[in-house]
Amino acid sequence: MKKILISVMLFAACVFAVSAQEKEKEVKKGWSFGVLPTATFSVDNGFQAGAFGDVYNYGDGNTYPDPLHKFSWEVSYFTKSQRMRFYLAYDSKYLIPNMRVNVSATYVRDPLYSFWGFNGGASLAGLANPYDLWTNKDVNSNYFGINYYGMSRNMLRILANVQGRIVPHLNWAAGINFWNWQVGDMKDTGFKVKGDNDKHYYDKTSTLYRDYVALGIISADEAAGGNALELNAGLVFDTRDIEAAPNRGIWAEAYLNGNVLAHQYLKACVYFRHYVDIPIHIKAGDPVFAYRLAWQQTIAGQTPLYMIQNVPLLVQRNMISEGFGSSNTIRGLRENRILTEGFAWLNTELRVKIVNFKLFNQFFYIAVNPFFDAGIITKAARAQAFERAKTANAATFLPLSSIYDASKVGDIVYSAGAGLKIAMNQNFIISAEFAKCFYKPLDAGLWIGIGINYQF
């Protein structure tokens, strides 16, 4: 998959280099459509089939490269995890004068969702190779395969966020997000084992999810899911010249985010992003050094199982905003590998445009972005529950000593890699990134992430 993607992108660069004299800064008017098949692959979920895209309305071009209105959508299915995703979103800074409106609806069905436990490297620390127990189809003595990290979840999310101007570049922000979660054992449809025509299944009783419930780390009133109604409010400081891929400016947010239904909690969220233009005058555009400093922590209450993976955002850049690990935070880690109550992280990358060109009356550029990511847990999840579990008299598939080591909670996680981007009209950006985690307990080999947009 990696070789095919790189070949296609290099071919595009060669074919259209003759048009590299075209300037991206030309004005785009009217409607613009970006539609692509979701022919991607990830280690966590397998191949993705479906389609996604953005629809932009630039009006008379006075706001270009920012659109007057933006619609985003996706319909897709993943072959390995059998995940289904449906997504529709709208974003505009011009629908209501001096206000930004962002609304979306999302449905995700995850029959084979991977739950890696709480607190990152502390989870599964006693296992020589935790990934031996991940979707292992070799039949054991009970005629079952082992997917120790398997569980299921269905999610419905409806959100609406607004921002209004206080003074130039400083906005107030507020929003409301509704979630409905149904979680439980894997919903396994069966699989074939080489040399055997019978259909086999994963053992639903031998999972980390079941062990956490038995040990009391996951309580009975959250084990099957529930509803959440999150309210958020805060401030946004924004001096970016372009939203999708800034050349210069600062984008900072500070806000509180809390659930007012069952399992109430309150989180503090701080994000600081800085984009620095490097005056090396490449024909396609100056390189940009970009970095993000971020911190999210529960300051009151306890986040339930079904919400702990969420990374609250005032404006959605991607369909799913979750997971310390994977494309949203620390690249090179498995999806949602770090589930905790507090986390601080750093992302740095150098964005270099290689070539720009015009095709079918659309403006394109190709860029690369080498990057380095790092993060650390600032507040562990369920620390008291893990202490109580040491004396729990419960039948589990693996003992607590094999699946948790509290001494690793404070370890620094870091990774590095590089990405390739193709952008249309400076807004519709196809992204392919490759990374490696250098913190051994969370190293799972080469990570591949293919999707849309820069990470931040």
Listing of model-derived features with the role each one plays in the protein:
Residues F33-V35, H69-W73, M99-S104, L170-A174, ...:
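Transmembrane beta-strands of outer-membrane beta-barrel proteins
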Residues F41-V43, V55-N57, V75-S81, A105-P111, ...:
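Transmembrane beta-strands of outer-membrane beta-barrel pores
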Residues G234, I242-F360, A380, S402:
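C-terminal outer-membrane beta-barrel translocator/porin domains of Gram-negative envelope proteins
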Residues W31-F33, N45-A49, Q82-F86, S152-I158, ...:
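Residues that define the transmembrane beta-barrel architecture of outer-membrane proteins
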Residues Q21-S32, G59-L68, L95-V101, R165-W172, ...:
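Short loop/turn motifs that connect adjacent beta-strands in outer-membrane beta-barrel proteins
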Residues A51-W73, E230-H274, G417-F434:
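Surface-exposed extracellular loop regions of Gram-negative outer-membrane beta-barrel proteins
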Residues K23-F33, F41-D221, N328, L442-Q455:
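Gram-negative/organellar outer-membrane beta-barrel architecture
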Residues L293-W295, K421-F456:
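Predominantly the C-terminal beta-signal and adjacent terminal strand-loop region
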